[in-house]
Amino acid sequence: MPPASPSNISRKPLTGGPEKISVARLPVTGSDVFGREEDIAFLNDAWAKQQVNIVTFIAWAGVGKSTLVNHWLRLMSAEHYHSAQLVFGWSFYRQGSGGGTSSADEFLDATLTWFGDPDPRLGTAWEKGERLAKLIAHRRTLLVLDGLEPLQNPPGPQAGRVREPSLQALLRELAAFNKGLCVITTRLPVADIADYECTSAPRRDLEQLSSEAGAKLLRALGIKESVTQ
């Protein structure tokens, strides 16, 4: 009997991993992470708890928000993302040589299409956000939104409020109900979901690395500590 050709071989679908993954739009960061054990535990706990829908990491530039989340994603990947059905990451800072920031419209078009919306252009901005939330929330979805601050109001009377109605709707809906988890990194607390901080959308202020953890990171990067330190 002649051997079966590759096109005729029946392959069983792989189990134990997400149906779809897209993380290429997240920023490229270093692989070395030190002194973030409590933050990793916080993320693991949030993913395991059904009552937690959104977590937000708050810190200024350079503290390591994106590096932390990328490291956690690598840990999740090694365990087939722990029951996640869909994994999607987006940075509001464009990657590559062009740089700049991405708009809410760009985000909506990409995410509605990726999550299977039949007509991403249909409806108002608010309606699109609500529709996207439904597509995300009713599956065990891991959604990572990196660098939200370009779409938030700066410090002032409306500090931290998201300026785009579509994202306001998305985040409000996910805070109210979400079978999975949305992880946000930003420089400012998200005012639109502040009323959920004590329940389904806790925030975590990311601290600077301790001196010991910082020294380990420098050694890993091949940088010698100064004698004065």
Language model region names:
Residues 38-48, 52-159, 200, 219:
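Post-nucleotide-binding-loop coupling segment downstream of the phosphate-binding loop, primarily
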Residues 16-19, 26-27, 56, 144, ...:
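Preference for short coil/turn "hinge" residues that link or interrupt alpha-helices
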Residues 2-43:
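Conserved adenine-nucleotide phosphate-binding loops and their immediately adjacent elements
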Residues 32-33, 89, 205:
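Conserved beta-strand positions that form and line the central face of beta-propeller blades
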Residues 6, 22-30, 57, 61-63, ...:
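Contiguous N-terminal and early-domain "leader" segments and peripheral loops that mark the onset or edge
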Residues 25, 135-137, 176:
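Short, flexible hinge/linker loops that cap or flank conserved catalytic cores
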Residues 31-34, 124, 162:
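Residue-level "hotspot" positions that anchor or transmit function at local structural transition points
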Residues 17, 36-39, 67-71, 102-113, ...:
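Alpha-helical sensor/transducer elements of the RecA-like P-loop NTPase core
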